[in-house]
């Protein structure tokens, strides 16, 4: 085996998303990389996904809130469907609720990923009366109260909102039969809900419970502490560490067979047996499966204050 020194290139994309694919092609021509590892994409990864599929470049476990891929794709793999998985979890709960809910009202801010999640929930709930209410992109969080005034006991409320908007909810919760919030958008167990809302709300939670993932995540945090790397976005950093570790281990196993398709196949084979899976209880990939974590919980706050959670039922694989 020939010893090789791997070099990391950082590609930064600028300007509007419709120009990203051309920038990526220019980067690839100048630096013909073997794979794209992790990455930070926020709410729009579609141009990067298209590029990786078109150029046959493995695109491995990016940090994105709305994955662009489909299970039928090959070169792009993700840890989770993100808020789209949360929409499926809530749809599962709505199905269990039967006819007791007359109307589902979804609230999201224009231009944010909650819009995609709201579309996914509507698509997963055929026959339901679903009404979307939209906060203006740069509007005041105080406008939330007006959007919730007419809700009643036969309604359910879904909040696809960031922490800043959750903080601005009125002190008394809406008089609905059910309230769900997005865990990924709201901050998971640190979602800053007003006290009365904490009692009423259920959280779509697309990762393992804090007490069950603590050992796996602490292993990663210890690695950061030893190297004096500040932790400023714990899940993003843990997922990035996991992605880099998976790729490093896989490269050791493929010896000199540096073929991009083979890298994907080896990751599929190795992932199912991995013990340290970070935020996720179990990860698995296979042909026709491009999202490694396939389920989540519905949880509620256990106390009037603090971050302790109680699951409302078992792990759900929608």
Pin down the residues of each PLM region.
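Extracytosolic ligand-binding ectodomains
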Residues: 1-318
């Amino acid at each position: 085996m020939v010893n090789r020194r791997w070099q990391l290139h950082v590609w930064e994309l600028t300007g509007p998303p419709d120009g990203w694919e051309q920038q990526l092609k220019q980067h690839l021509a100048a630096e013909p990389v073997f794979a794209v590892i992790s990455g930070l994409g926020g709410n729009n990864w579609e141009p990067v996904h298209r590029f990786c599929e078109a150029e046959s470049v493995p695109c491995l476990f990016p940090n994105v809130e709305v994955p662009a891929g489909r299970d039928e794709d090959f070169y792009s793999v993700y840890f989770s469907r993100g808020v789209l998985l949360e929409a499926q979890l809530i749809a599962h709960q709505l199905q269990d609720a039967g006819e007791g809910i007359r109307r589902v009202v979804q609230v999201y801010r224009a231009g944010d990923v909650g819009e995609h999640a709201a579309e996914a929930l509507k698509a997963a709930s055929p026959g339901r009366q679903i009404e979307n209410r939209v906060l203006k992109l740069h509007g005041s969080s105080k406008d939330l109260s007006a959007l919730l005034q007419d809700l009643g006991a036969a309604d359910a409320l879904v909040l696809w909102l960031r922490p800043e908007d959750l903080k601005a909810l009125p002190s008394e919760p809406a008089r609905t039969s059910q309230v769900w919030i997005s865990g990924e958008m709201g901050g998971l167990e640190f979602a800053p809900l007003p006290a009365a809302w904490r009692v009423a709300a259920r959280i779509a939670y697309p990762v393992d419970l804090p007490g069950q993932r603590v050992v796996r995540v602490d292993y990663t945090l210890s690695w950061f502490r030893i190297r004096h790397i500040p932790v400023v976005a714990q899940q993003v950093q843990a997922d990035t560490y996991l992605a880099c570790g998976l790729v490093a281990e896989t490269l050791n196993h493929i010896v000199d067979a540096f073929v991009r398709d083979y890298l994907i196949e080896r990751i599929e084979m190795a992932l199912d047996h991995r013990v340290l899976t970070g935020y996720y209880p179990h990860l698995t990939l296979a042909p026709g499966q491009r999202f490694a974590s396939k389920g989540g919980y519905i949880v509620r706050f256990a106390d009037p204050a603090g971050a302790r959670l109680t699951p409302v039922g078992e792990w759900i694989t929608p």
